[in-house]
Structures are given as structure tokens and as C-alpha cells.
Amino acid sequence: MKALFYPTFHQTAARGITQRADPRVGPRHRPAAKRKVVKEMAKKETAPYKIYLTENELPTSWYNLRADMKTKPAPLLHPGTLKPLKFEDMQPIFCDELIKQELDNDTQFIPIPGPVMDFYKMYRPSPLVHAEFLEKLLDTPAKIYYKFEGNNTSGSHKLNSAIAQAYYAKAQGLKGVTTETGAGQWGTALSMACSYFDLDCKVYMVKVSYEQKPFRREVMRTYGANVTPSPSMDTEVGRRINAEHPGTTGSLGCAISEAVEVAVSTPGYRYELGSVLNQVLLHQSVIGLETKAACDKYGIEPDIIIGCAGGGSNLGGLIAPFMGEKLRGEKDYRFIAVEPASCPSFTRGKYVYDFADTGKVCPMAKMYTLGHDFIPSANHAGGLRYHGMSPVLSELYHEGLMEARSYEQTAVFEAAVQFARVEGILPAPESAHAIKGAIDEALKCKETGEEKTIIFGLTGTGYFDLVAYQKYNDGEMSDYIPTDEDLAKGFASIPQVDL
């Protein structure tokens, strides 16, 4: 029976092991020269396939990138007066502590509350993964890493901000919150967070995603959320949008308008947003802080950092500490935002003040926008179907500190399938935009022979997006790129703001 547990000499030799391990041969028994070699090897520890930080290495503060920006994002404007918003102007919509975070351009680090830290430990730190198998498939000299945010029930990075926002709502004594969701990741995350803190949660889900992703809404309902397709007939703005655009599949801008209307008209409720706002990018900085800590721990020096871009929450969080280094003149990186060709806010939008929502009830933001009346085609990357972009990222892009590109969805899904077959994760359609960007950069390295290090954000999993994968696998997926005339209609809705 002993041989079952302790291999004999013949068994170990068969495995290529020609010497038995002697437990007495520890560091004290090694020759000095050998001890030196072992010590040098320890200094150059090779990064594992998956880098997991310990709980003790989890960031204890969020990083506020605005503190290091020489040119701050333009202030939000009151939709009625067109004056910069003050704290009291925002109180009917947002939680008080979140308003403070939204307006704070100076505090570099903001402590993460204890209850939020406790919740983070359920699924954080998340892994930084070396995409070795993708590298081999592409036959590239580039090194590719991805920060995987899909290791929680919500399936994405959205939980990082959802739990923070729910905590502040509970601490303020509120009864519940309202929100919008595109593909459903944010709605799922907020429903989880509200369940944890015993808050009501009303979710307005973009109609096309509500119909495409029935199981995503069931997860939300499982966590106690009330889920309504948007535009609905429950709100004044929803009824108006349905009347003006019969048969519309909706947009994030529509859903935001409905959620805000319900929040401001219901006592004890506030609205919580999953992207775009400064406060959201602040919470999502935990992604970048962990990524940088993992890189520093193993001597990984990225050259290119890539993220998908809809409203900017994942991209802004991933690049935050690296962009901070660039702004302070400490290091240089390339940052690439990847968006859908069907909703090209960065690559074809205008950098102006616009309403953050279709119903014009939200504050106005200076951002890259296609116009608040722009309703994109029914792209399967529902989380990227937003007409605008984060004011923080918009300012950075405007200053030339980051790049942007757009892809058609068939090319994106081709990249998603390539990745899934070698890396073993079915990516969300949104995440697949970043994968496509990373693959293209890696193939450029193959052409030039450069050994660049690429990091991209894998924002979440695509297990609720199987209708989209079915369309792609059956050859029924089509691409749509808005014409100049289509964009002109959206641009026509942009208000004239002279400051």
C-alpha cells in the first residue's frame, strides 16, 4: 500500500526523476555557490499563469484620477439654468456622499468604507491572467495579460461600484434606488448590492436587451429587483419616447431618463448610475490599483492598456493608476479605448456639452457625444450602446493622452470565439471589443518583431449572451455602421451651450 502514496525509485525514474529527494538537504546543507544561485532565482520569481493578490494586498482606498489631471473635466451643468451644478442641485437625484465624490477634483485617495471592503473580499482581488494560449495561437512575440472581472455572480466589474453606491444609500437611510441597465450587468450588480443592504431596487432595462437576455433579468428578479423594459408606459418620459419613436428598441439614454423620473418623484429613493460619472470611475479604480500592484509584484511593465468603452467605467478604472503615472511624468503608456462601430462616441462624436439622457432630465456633461436623441442599432453589446462618454475620459482623449478605435460586431465576435477556444472563458460581447483590440496590437508585434506587453480588461462573461453567439455561429449576425446622415440627426439634438 505504501507505493500508492510514496512513489518508488522506479516509479519516479519513469517520470524522468532520477534522484530521490532527501529531506535533510535544506538550505544549510547546500554548498555556498548553490545557495547563491537559489537566492538569485528567488529574486527573479516568474509570474504565475494567474496572479492573485492576497486579501492583505487589496486596495484600501479608491484612487481619484482627477486629482492628477492638470485640466479637470468640465463641470456638470444644471439642465435648466445651464450653470455648474452645486451640491444642493444634485440632492434630489443622488445620495449625499456620492455627490461629494462626484464634485471632488482634489482628493487623491478616498478610503473604502469597511462594509464595502468586507463585501469586496467575497470576490476580490480578481486575477490578472497571462493569456499564454492566445499568444501561442497568434504566434506573437507580444506578452498579453487580461484583468478578469467576471468572477462574481453579476458576471462583471459593475459590482465594484454597485456595492459602494448601495452602501451610501443605506447609510443615508433611504428605502430604495432606481437605475438603468443595458446588457444587464449593472442591473444585476445593483440588485445584488441592494439585496445585501436590504434596499428596494427598480431597474429600467433597455428593451432590446430585455428581450435578448431573459435569463439576465431573472437573475435580477432573484435578487429582489423590479425589472421593466425601457422605454415603458409607466413614466411620462417613456410614454413620450414611445410616441415619438414607435417600435423603438430603446437606449441607455431612454432608460436613464425613466429611472431618474421615478427616483425624483418617489420619497426615500435616489438614482444610481453604473457608468459615465466621476464617482463610478472612482470606485472602479480598484481594478487598476490591483492590476498595477500585480504588475509591480512580478516586474511586469505594460506598454499598451486596452479597454472597451461604452460610458467608460471599466476603461476608466483599469487605466486610472497608470494614467496617473503618465500625467505625473513618471512613465509612459499607450491607452486604447475600443467601442462599437454602431455607436462610435469617441471616434465620430463631438466634444461638447450634451444631456446625459434622452429625456433631458439629467445634468448636462461635456463629453464626446452622438447627441442625446441618437438611438443606436440593436447591437449585441448592449452595455456599449450609450450616446456619450465619461467626462474624465473625454478630457483625456481630447488632450491626446489616449487613443480610440471602433469595430464592427462580426469582427468582435470572431475575436471572442478565438479567445474562448484557447483561454477557456466565454467573454461578454462588451469585453470582446477589448479582446479584438488586443489581438490586433499583438499581430502588429508579430509583423514588427516587437516584444510589447499588452494588458486588456476582460470585463465579464458572456453566458447570458448566448443569443448573440447563436447569431454569430449561424452566420446570421449583421453589421451596422451609422451613416453621416444618421449621425447628423443625433447631432441636431445637441443644445447650444455658451459658457
Q: What are these regions, as identified by a protein language model?
A:
Residues 309-317, 409-474:
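Claisen-condensing/thiolase-fold acyl-transfer catalytic domains that form or cleave C-C bonds
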Residues 109-111, 241-279, 287, 299, ...:
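Active-site/ligand-binding loops adjacent to catalytic centers
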Residues 164-174, 188-200, 221-222, 319-329, ...:
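Alpha-helix C-terminal capping segments
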Residues 148-159, 177-186, 277-280, 306-311, ...:
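Active-site nucleophile and cofactor-binding loops and adjacent substrate-binding regions
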